[in-house]
From Swiss-Prot:
It comes from the Eukaryota. Substrate binds at residues 37, 227, 252-253, 285. ATP binds at residues 39-42, 78, 163. SUPFAM superfamilies: Phosphoenolpyruvate/pyruvate domain (SSF51621), PK beta-barrel domain-like (SSF50800), PK C-terminal domain-like (SSF52935). Pfam families: PK, PK_C. Pathway: Carbohydrate degradation; glycolysis; pyruvate from D-glyceraldehyde 3-phosphate: step 5/5. InterPro entries: Pyr_Knase (IPR001697), Pyrv/PenolPyrv_kinase-like_dom (IPR015813), Pyrv_kinase-like_dom_sf (IPR040442), Pyrv_Knase-like_insert_dom_sf (IPR011037), Pyrv_Knase_AS (IPR018209), Pyrv_Knase_brl (IPR015793), Pyrv_Knase_C (IPR015795), Pyrv_Knase_C_sf (IPR036918). This is Probable pyruvate kinase, cytosolic isozyme. Mg(2+) binds at residues 229, 253. K(+) binds at residues 39, 41, 71-72. Homotetramer. It comes from Arabidopsis thaliana (Mouse-ear cress).
Amino acid sequence: MAMEQRPKTKIVCTLGPASRSVPMVEKLLMAGMSVARFNFSHGSYEYHQETLDNLRQAMLNTGMLCAVMLDTKGPEIRTGFLKDGKPIQLKQGQEITISTDYDLKGDEKTICMSYKKLAQDVNPGMVILCADGTISLKVLSCDKEKGTVRCRCENTSMLGERKNVNLPGVVVDLPTLTEKDKQDILEWGVPNQIDMIALSFVRKGSDLVQVRKLLGKHAKTILLMSKVENQEGVANFDDILINSDAFMIARGDLGMEIPIEKIFLAQKVMIYKCNFMGKPVVTATQMLESMIKSPRPTRAEATDVANAVLDGTDCVMLSGETAAGAYPELAVRTMAKICVEAESTLDYGDIFKRIMLHAAVPMSPMESLASSAVRTATSSRATLMMVLTRGGSTARLVAKYRPGIPILSVVVPEITSDSFDWACSNEAPARHSLIYRGLVPVLYAGSARASIDESTEETLEFASEYGKKKQLCKTGDSVVALFRTGNAIVIKILTVK
C-alpha cells in the first residue's frame, strides 16, 4: 500500500483467532494497522505470547513498526453458570431471583451474579442489564440478609452462561485494577515490553496514580490509556484525562450506562477535550461490526468511522472485526479508505485556529515553537514536516496542532558511550507516536563519530530520503524541519534535493 494512501488517522486492531498467524498479521500491517490490541478478557498467557511472537516476526518481515496494547479485563460483573450448561429462556413479565452465591447453578427461576454487594447497591425500580443489554431486568425487591434480588424480565430472550452485567447508575464497589489485572500487567506486560495499557472501567484520576505506582520505573515507557465506561467515570472525566497519557472511548459499556441517544454527544465532547489537551484519543466498539460476517460495512458504519475522523479522533479501533471476523484484512483496508476520504474534507486552517484559541497563555516555549512550525508549514505550502526528537514529546506537540501534511518523527538515539541502546532510549517513543494522528515514526541509527552539526545535517538528509522513499515528498518540494542544535531550537525550511 503506497504511503500516500495510508490515512493520518491510526488503526488499532484486536488480534484473535482470525488474525494471529504471521501471514495474516503481515497483511494487517500492510493494510494499515498501527497498534495491535491484546484483549485480556479472553485467552491464556501462552496464547497471547504466541500471538505477540507472531506479531514481532511479522514486524521483522515487513520492516514496519507496530505498538502493543494490553487491554485489561477490569472489574467485570458476570452472570453465573447454568444447570447442564444450557441457555435458559426468559420471558417478558416473568419474575426471577438473582443470588450472589456464585456456586449456584442457575435455572429459569434463579440465576446468580458475581457481585457480592448487589442486594445492597440496587434499589427497587432500578434496571439490571445482562449480555450487552439484550436482557433487561427490573428490580422489584432486595433481601440484603440473604443477598438476593427479585426482578421482573422486561423482554423475552435467551440467557447463556457467564454473560456481562451492567448496573446503570450504581457506583460499583470494585477496584479498577483487579488482582488478575495486576498479574497480567506485571507477569506478562512488563516482561514483554508492551507500549501501552488500556485500563477498563476507570472511575477517577487517582485510579491512574495507583497504576503508575504499580508500574514503578516502567511507568516511563508504558503509556496509560483510560477507558471511561460508566457514569462515575463520565462525571470525573476531566480529572481522569489530566492523569492519563491517552484515552479510549469504549462505546460498548458506556452505551449501557448512559442513554443510547446521548452517546454521540459524549463521544464528541470527549474527543474535543482530548484534542485541546494534545492527548491521543481512540474511538472504539462496533465501528464496522457487520464486517465480522459481511465483506461490506453498513452505510451507518461507514458514516460512523468518517464522523469519528471529522470529530478529531486520533485512532479508530476494530475489535471482533479483526479478532474473530471472516474478513480481517478487508476490514482494515475498508477502514483506511474511509479515513483517507474523511481527512480530505477537513479544513486544517480552521482546526489550527480553534486549537490556538483554546491554548493556554502563556504557552510553554516548546509548544509555541511547535505551533509556529505548523503555521510555517502551512504558509510555505510544505508537503512534509520533519521533527528530530529523542523522547518523542516535540513531535507529539506538533501533532497536537493538526497540520494537513504528514509529520515525520525522526527518533534519534541518545549516545551512551559507543553503543546505541535502542531498547531504553528509542523504540518506545517511536512506537508511542503510533497512536497520534499524522505522526509517521522512523528510527535513525546515526553515526556516533559525527559532531552535533554534522549529525543534524546527516539526520535531515536521511529524513528527506526516507520521505521520498515513502512517497511523503518528492524532489523540489518544501519541507519544514524542527530540531534542536546545541541550546537553540531551529525551524528550518528545506527544499528536497
